[in-house]
């Protein structure tokens, strides 16, 4: 029995080593995070089927005299049995992928075991199917909670799976005496080894994914800090003064030896190692930067020669260079240098790729703000709604609070905030957008607001598909929804409903409606709302005034903002031409 245990431990060790190697491959880790999709399930079926086939092939042959032999077997004699790690691989397949994956791997493993032959080979097809279904059931329960079974629970399930195997041997074998004799030899070693192996396999999966999640949380926290501190300088545009401050902030927050920012032609700032010859106002020295400016793609190098600095005593040995874009055109680069090539890891690359998008958006935001100040002759443009700084910083603070609690939710909100910014930038340059884009902007805004005040607002959007390509002014619905959230409900914590709908007004016009069940508008302010700024504890009402001016400027006085208000709620609406976006 001890010899069998040691031989089984060798087989389990091989499985565990392969599991560890797989879980350190980024593609496989991403596959685990997408395990509920059918594409991922099919891929998991293939991977775990290979594990199961290997378990069968590397089993330990046991004859009637209890002699043990271990090798790679494709076919077995009719009077021998096989002890292996098949139950481990089928069980883990079910725990990870659910019933479909567990059943599939169980059937494949069982069929191959029957093909190999041996005493009562059909028994192992039956037991494999049972094990796959039962393990898949426990896996499905964990999936519904968006978790994996705990290590202790995985070990207990491994024990149960092996007991099912032993019960199947006893029940379905033709020679009961031989079955009892076989079970007395293999039961304890296989139960112990395969249950421990199942627990270790699952612990590798859980710990690897948890480590990645913690890494993402740290990255998100670092990115948020960078965004908070660099945003004011990016808004000034890409010049020497702002670039110097940005480079200092990045170097202080990230483990890099030097940071440089360039325009398309010259070095704007260089902070850290190599600053004696990488001097601002000089022409770009490195061939690496020139390559990135030409190709528009991020580049990573790990030698001095690849950096391409001509100075003989340059201490820089590795670098990652990020192109900075504005409206699709390259305007400069952000470069992070390392004096030790080993300091440039996968984490730094992932962080750099994220910063590239964020910094480019911030540059566009700053450029849009600069341009808006210069458009003195464009009345409608000057009335476009702008991103509220209070909303931005409140959103950043909310995401920061979520980073340590729920990093995945924080990541989702960060993407919503990015989409919100981009939509605002696009809206500031357009007279009209489709209703579908406007609703997407509203949903991004609501995601951020509902993260700050969970469960406080109920938003109902009732818009038929045929109206989704109707052209509307940017921020039309967002401003009305935001107005309801800020002013309609005072301190009421629940039961706050906002309804957004679009209905047909005439054959050529539609009515857009935003309705709330708040406290209503006081009579002394009703005649002023939308016509002039209205002072209140939570705002001036200028957003509604600007919106009304834009509506009338674009579509005439008939499109002016209208409303009705009682103590049980307020309804805003406007009637717009049924103009649709032309198909390209």
From Swiss-Prot:
Changes after translation: Autophosphorylated on His-390.
InterPro entries: Bact_2-comp_sensor_kinase, GAF, GAF-like_dom_sf, HATPase_C_sf, Sig_transdc_His_kin_internal, Sig_transdc_His_kinase_LytS_TM
E.C. numbers: 2.7.13.3, 3.1.3.-
Gene Ontology BP term (one): cell wall organization
GO cellular component, one term: plasma membrane
Coiled-coil region list: none
Pfam families: 5TM-5TMR_LYT (PF07694), HATPase_c (PF02518), His_kinase (PF06580)
Spans through the membrane: 2-22, 42-62, 92-112, 121-141, 154-174, 186-206
CDD domains per record: HATPase_LytS-like (cd16957)
PANTHER family in the cross-refs: SENSOR HISTIDINE KINASE YPDA (PTHR34220:SF7)
Protein name: Sensor histidine kinase/phosphatase LytS
